[in-house]
Regions:
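Bacterial N-terminal signal peptides that target proteins for export
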Residues: 1-9
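C-terminal motif of bacterial Sec signal peptides marking the signal peptidase cleavage site
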Residues: 16-19
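Low-complexity, acidic/polar, glycine-enriched regions of mature
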Residues: 21-212
Length: 212
């Protein structure tokens, strides 16, 4: 009888321990799930505040000359979500006639001596990949499609997307020569060399709002 009582108490004790362990294991996933949900951030873009800034370079020492485009259209496939989600498959068309450097003498020359020779009335861009380390966009100029890398970062309430272009990849040499000939003197540096580089840096700014 004593052995039976001892055996019964032992089984009850083991059952209680097993039940406690099972309860703890069930609670753990709930805590992890709650933490994961809280880490997901939800953003949206104020499309009315988007801007495009480009910087080209003259002189041997590469002095930057910057400008913007006043007319462009942005097509977002996703109007809210993470930064990666907002950028996914986003498209942009840019009217090159709207090029604006704030210089009334320079701007007409850019239209006639560069973009006209470049056969590019409209620049078309599309985000192809937003994965970290694989950020790629497609850019069409001079009837040529070419993929380029980009980076993006969030600073305060603005999403910055930056990319570097080599216009030679879109057969832009003749257009560069045409513009440099038109602006020969203003492209001549202290070394007496007139130089217009094929490099262009582009920065897109997207005002971001965090949704609750």
């Amino acid at each position: 009888m004593k052995q039976l009582l001892s055996y019964t108490l032992s089984m009850i004790f083991v059952f209680l321990i097993f039940s406690c362990n099972t309860s703890e294991k069930k609670k753990a996933p709930q805590q992890d799930e709650g933490t994961q949900v809280q880490s997901v951030q939800n953003y949206s873009i104020d499309t009315s505040g988007v801007s495009i800034k480009w910087t080209a370079y003259k002189f041997t020492e590469k002095l930057g000359v910057s400008g913007i485009f006043d007319q462009f259209a942005l097509n977002l496939k996703n109007d809210h979500g993470s930064l990666e989600t907002l950028l996914e498959d986003a498209e942009m068309t840019i009217n090159t006639v709207s090029v604006n450097t704030g210089n009334e003498i320079r701007d007409p020359k850019l239209r006639t001596s560069f973009f006209k020779i470049f056969h590019t009335d409209t620049i078309f861009g599309k985000i192809l990949d937003t994965k970290e380390g694989q950020e790629t966009l497609e850019l069409k100029m001079n009837n040529i499609l070419h993929n380029v890398a980009y980076t993006y970062s969030l600073k305060n309430d603005t999403l910055f997307l930056t990319t570097h272009l080599d216009l030679r990849q879109w057969n832009g040499v003749e257009a560069l020569k045409s513009l440099n000939k038109e602006c020969y003197e203003v492209h001549t540096g202290g070394d007496g060399i007139s130089k217009l580089w094929p490099d262009v840096d582009v920065v897109l700014k997207f005002p971001i709002k965090m949704n609750l």
